[in-house]
Design a protein with these regions (language model features):
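Activity-critical C-terminal alpha-helical subdomain
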Residues: 184, 443-478
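C-terminal substrate-recognition/cap domain of FAD-linked oxidoreductases
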Residues: 27-34, 220-224, 233-236, 243-413, ...
Length: 478
């Protein structure tokens, strides 16, 4: 990692063993700390004086308070599954990594209030299972749900496949428990759906990537479990056709439409190549494919009847060329595996350049067509691996190298490719980060695309919440 950012007044001569007592488990052996210092994509590797794993909020508060007194940088970390380098320290070796992995308790489930209170280190899949056991649904769902954590989901305002119906992490959170940059504990786990008593502090911490404080627990919204779900794959010619299918599906299914995922043929080809249990779904390849899911509150028969009517209308309108409707839970899971394995398949294929962007839904077709053409002109042979949550305007517009090109040669093009893609995003009034966050990877680009007024306001917030600059320095706003 090339960035080094020291907090204000940092004491560089301190020994790691000067850490205070009663802060939880302390790791200093390189073999123990190594997994916490390398990001998921293996692009960023840092050093730290120690990795600390508290098990209670009071231990977090003691550690943060000590870091504030000693001017020691602190890097909060959840499952370390982020894609922008936001959860690992720089290479100065001055920081303490605060791993929340041991704060992994479900504190409460209230089926009447439809809430679940989970500590920051609870794995997302564990929260989903706890809700399911209580007869409820926690709808946040993403490919890394077996290893990402609630704290990380909230710190990056994670999205996932259910945003179309349920919203992103911010919209699923009712309350937070936070340790401030001064080591104080804010007890905000009230679980209220209405609270008009001033500034919404919760919303400031969500999406702040650990730069304002440490989220230690959250009260989350639960929903009734659907009586039935129907999943289908639809083959079509273009993102423009997918947008028309989305409009039709929303008009016929309304809020029952809970998933609408777009995938290019390149995505499906990579998944079939690198996952032997994920065969190509259709006999003949099609340029694009959509994964649709409907959740029904009445019955399986009612859900199937409505979905069949949608598919019939889509065929009659010429929107889709082929379709497969899952006939079992196992087949539905196979359909979802095609979508969820895309990132892993692209990683297995080799280095790639990722873009987590959003544009107005109505602009997606034109954006993809124009950007594909521009990349093909300026970087002949590059392979566009495009997929994402069409229903909320979020695309993972990734680029893989031409076949046979040296990876280092390809990565040398990264700044130019990023500029082309992100300029196109800006021209469409979009965002260069829809759900992955800014971290280190997008920090300089955010400074380029945000207005001076926005940046000044963000810096004012950062200075107010973290006047010493100890919280995850060098990330997000810098």
């Amino acid at each position: 990692m090339t960035f080094v950012t020291l907090c204000r007044g940092h004491n560089p001569g301190m020994n790691p063993l000067d850490l205070p007592a009663d802060i939880g488990r302390v790791l200093t052996d390189p073999a123990d700390t190594a997994p916490f210092l390398l990001d998921w994509r293996k692009r960023y590797v840092g050093r730290a004086r120690a990795v600390v794993q508290p098990s209670h909020v009071e231990e977090v508060a003691r550690l943060v308070g000590w870091c504030a007194e000693q001017r020691v940088p602190l890097v909060p970390q959840g499952g370390n599954t982020g894609l922008t380098g936001g959860s690992v320290p720089d290479d100065s070796g001055t920081a303490v990594v605060l791993s929340l992995a041991r704060m992994n308790r479900i504190r409460a489930i209230d089926p009447i209030n439809n809430t679940l209170t989970a500590e920051a280190g609870v794995v997302l899949a564990t929260a989903q299972s706890a809700a399911d056991a209580a007869g409820r649904l926690f709808p946040l769902s993403l490919a890394a749900q077996g290893s990402c954590t609630i704290g990380g989901n909230l710190s990056t305002n994670a999205g996932g496949t259910g945003v179309l119906r349920y919203g992103n992490a911010r919209e699923l959170c009712l309350g937070l428990e936070v340790v401030t940059a001064r080591g104080e504990i804010w007890h905000g786990l009230r679980g209220l759906r209405k609270d008009n008593t001033g500034y919404d502090l919760r919303d400031l911490f969500i999406g702040s990537e650990g730069t304002l404080g440490v989220i230690t627990a959250a009260t989350l919204k639960l929903f009734p479990k659907p009586a039935a779900q129907v999943t289908a794959l639809a083959a079509l010619a273009s993102p423009h056709a997918a947008l028309k299918l989305l409009e039709l599906a929303q008009s016929m299914l309304g809020p029952a439409l809970t998933g609408f995922e777009l995938m290019s043929q390149m995505c499906l080809s990579l998944v079939a190549r690198h996952f032997t249990d994920c065969a190509a779904p259709f006999e003949a390849p099609h340029p694009w494919c959509v994964l649709l899911e409907s959740s029904d509150s009445q019955s399986e028969a009612h859900a199937t009847e409505r979905f069949d009517a949608l598919m019939e209308q889509a065929f009659e309108s010429g929107l889709i060329a082929d379709a497969l409707i899952a006939q079992s839970i196992a087949q539905s899971r196979r359909f979802w595996a095609l979508r969820e394995n895309i990132s892993e398949a692209q990683a297995a294929e080799g280095k790639n350049i990722k873009h987590d962007i959003s544009v107005p839904i109505s602009s997606i077709g034109d954006f993809v067509a124009a950007t594909d053409a521009a990349l093909a002109r300026q970087f002949p042979g590059v392979r566009m691996v495009v997929f994402g949550h069409l229903g909320d305007g979020n695309l993972h517009y990734n680029v893989s190298p031409p076949l046979g090109m040296n990876e280092d040669t390809f990565l040398a093009m990264q700044d130019d490719i990023n500029a082309l893609v992100h300029d196109a995003v800006a021209a469409n009034s979009g965002s260069i980060s829809a759900e992955h966050g800014i971290g280190v990877l997008r920090r300089n680009e955010m400074l380029r695309y945000k207005s001076p007024v926005e940046l000044a306001l963000m810096r004012t917030i950062k200075d107010a919440f973290d006047p010493l600059g100890i919280m995850n320095p060098g990330k997000l706003i810098g």
